[in-house]
A protein has these predicted regions:
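Short, glycine-/aromatic-enriched active-site segment of Class I SAM-dependent methyltransferases
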Residues: 42-45, 213-238, 242-246
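Extended interfacial segments that mediate partner engagement and assembly in macromolecular machines
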Residues: 55-155, 167, 233, 238, ...
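A short glycine-rich, Lys/Arg-flanked "PGG" loop and its adjoining helix->strand segment in the class I
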Residues: 195-212
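Hydrophobic, well-ordered beta-alpha structural blocks that scaffold small-molecule cofactor pockets
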Residues: 109-110, 116, 134, 271-409
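Conserved SAM-binding strand-loop segment of SAM-dependent methyltransferases
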Residues: 159-172
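A conserved beta-strand element that flanks and buttresses the S-adenosyl-L-methionine
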Residues: 183
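A SAM-dependent methyltransferase catalytic signature shared across enzymes that methylate proteins
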Residues: 25-32, 242-259
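N-terminal juxtadomain amphipathic helix
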Residues: 5, 9-95, 260
Length: 409
């Protein structure tokens, strides 16, 4: 249960060096502890059927450690026993027109770039299968999706009979599923032994040097520079800047063929090919470890002010009896409410995903409402968990006759 959460603590400069912790990304001994939030839900997207179950959801501690050898950041208190991804894990984003356009544009680019026509495609961490099925539709491809939370049949498509879903965690036992193209989107940040994971993919590919590997994760440079505390939560135990990601790929036997940002710089994307010996090529986006250290210092110096400002605003709106709603019930919402310890300041949370409606948010206990709920509620303010969706939200509100102020994070 989330209660009496200690205030997040940002340590001076790089934070205290913790010599007992080993970086899972490069093996270096010693991490600098620079940010702590205690007693947060260990999952953000497991949908709870009742408020009681949601309130009594297990909690853990979030303690970020920075590696001054490779630039990687990890939650040193992360315990993999809580990695209970299952069909009730609901992170499907394809109900958003904005996200759909991004996914379709990305898929079209990959199909064109790698000539993905009549090919075998593997997706590690495929969620409900939206992106894998899209790739198979666009290029008449065959697909295998590996994810413990997959729900076969959730996505209707003419390509469904060409896609096989395996409801398991990816491991070396899946080496036979390699194909012509491997993709992995928003999965690596949930895995703490990151070097081991990337190496497992490389070993699975073996000598098939034409197999490309595409991976997409959150861009931690933006998180640090923008003080995006809502993107720091227990499920995400691994945080990558572009340089840290490229370095672990090279160390695992991949040549980086492209490295870039997308989705308003929120996402970090990497493309790679297996090689015996990597080159010395460095991409412009790659920062040095010293630059990551400066971003960490910026975060520690300024995060408390941002958190205090949000607390003051929420308290002020509550005192004024303003109706304040959160739009977006996923991980950002859970991090926002629990980090600030202001669950009581928000009455309702809405979400566009119909599979979330009526369910309860883990650790928070709020029931998730559909956007149509706002027609009657008529909120004074809507706090938007991701500003990239403001335009589509405003359009929906106008169609529903809801006049309110959008407050993006």
């Amino acid at each position: 249960m989330v209660q009496n959460i200690s205030s997040p603590q940002a340590k001076p400069e790089l934070g205290k060096l913790s010599p007992e912790h080993i970086c899972p990304n490069c093996g270096h001994q010693g991490l600098h502890i620079f940010y702590e939030v205690r007693n947060v839900p260990v999952h953000s997207c497991l949908m709870m059927p009742s408020q009681e179950e949601a309130i009594n959801f297990p909690c853990g501690d979030l303690v970020l450690g920075f590696c001054d050898h490779c630039g990687f950041i990890t939650n040193v208190e992360f315990d993999s026993k809580w990695s209970a991804y299952a069909p009730n894990y609901e992170d499907q984003q394809s109900f958003s027109p904005t996200f759909n356009k991004f996914a379709r544009d990305l898929a079209n680019n990959l199909v064109a770039k790698y000539d993905l026509h009549n090919k075998d495609i593997i997706e590690i961490g495929c969620s409900k299968g939206d992106f894998l099925i899209l790739l198979c539709e666009l290029g008449n491809n065959r697909g295998v999706g590996i994810d413990p939370s997959v729900v076969p049949g959730r996505v209707e498509s003419e390509a469904a009979d060409r896609v096989t879903f395996i409801q398991e965690y990816y491991s070396a036992s899946h080496a036979k599923y390699v194909g012509d193209f491997i993709c992995c989107r928003h999965t690596l940040e949930h895995i703490q032994p990151t070097a081991e994971f990337v190496s497992t993919v490389r070993q699975s590919i073996g000598e098939r040097k034409d197999t490309a590997f595409f991976l997409e994760i959150p861009n931690n440079t933006r998180v640090l520079q923008d003080l995006a505390f809502e993107d720091i939560y227990y499920e995400h135990c691994s945080y990558f800047s572009p340089g840290a990601l490229a370095r672990v790929f090279r160390a695992s036997g991949f040549e980086v063929t492209d490295l870039y940002l997308a989705y308003d710089d929120q996402y970090l994307l990497i493309e790679a090919k297996p090689v015996d010996t990597t080159s010395d090529k460095i991409y412009p986006l790659e920062e040095t470890v010293a630059q990551v250290a400066e971003d960490v210092k910026h975060f520690t110096r300024n995060i408390q002010t941002k958190l205090d400002n949000w607390r003051l605003n929420l308290q002020k709106w509550k005192a004024e009896n303003q109706r304040v709603v959160v739009w977006g019930s996923g991980s950002k919402c859970v991090a926002f409410l629990t980090t600030l310890d202001t669950i009581d300041k928000i009455e309702y949370v809405v979400d566009i995903n119909p599979h979330r409606h009526g369910k309860f948010i883990p650790g928070v206990g709020k029931q998730i409402m559909s956007p149509e709920f706002l027609k009657d509620y008529q909120p004074d303010k809507i706090i938007v968990m991701n500003s990239i969706y403001c335009d589509e939200i405003q359009q929906m509100l106008q169609q529903m006759g809801v006049s309110t102020e959008l407050v993006p994070l």
